[in-house]
């Protein structure tokens, strides 16, 4: 689905901001859009180490913190599946009921910042995959949300 959206609107996309970049599964699709900056936000240690393979690309910027509606350290509940793919700042509730194979037995303290406080990060395409924390991320954009033309989010209707 994401690839179709990027293909359809790539002429209008002037930069990508991905919050919850994980290990960079979408980066190759982003790179098909020429002459844009790609900002990847990932605070979790294990996936971040894999994501760093893109550090050598001059148009890819890796930010080692999360985004939200505050500037502080928060607890990130780490899932035990696929390098923490379901990890979340929000304490799991129904997730473990609908996905009993996913366990949250660990956490990390991560840095979270408001996007509105960041400088020199431009893009009109926002991709969110933050396990229920989307509204807090959007609130942290404040007036900079007006610079976005596209918001793509992965969501679950179960929780």
What is the role of each PLM region?
Residues 1-159:
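Phosphate/nucleotide-binding beta-alpha loop and adjacent structural elements of enzyme active sites
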């Amino acid at each position: 689905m994401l690839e179709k959206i990027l293909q359809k609107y790539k002429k209008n996309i002037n930069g990508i901001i991905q919050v919850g970049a994980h290990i960079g599964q979408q980066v190759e699709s982003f790179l098909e859009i020429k002459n844009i900056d790609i900002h990847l936000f990932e605070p979790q240690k294990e996936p971040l180490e894999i994501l760093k393979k893109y550090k050598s690309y001059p148009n890819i910027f890796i930010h080692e913190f999360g985004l939200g509606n505050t500037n502080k350290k928060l607890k990130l509940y780490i899932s035990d599946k696929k390098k923490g793919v379901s990890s979340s700042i929000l304490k799991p509730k129904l997730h473990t009921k609908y996905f009993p194979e996913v366990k949250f037995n660990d956490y990390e303290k991560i840095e979270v910042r408001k996007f509105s406080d960041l400088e020199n990060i431009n893009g009109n395409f926002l991709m969110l995959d933050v396990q229920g924390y989307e509204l807090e991320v959007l609130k942290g954009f404040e007036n900079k949300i007006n610079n976005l033309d596209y918001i793509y989010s992965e969501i679950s209707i179960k929780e």
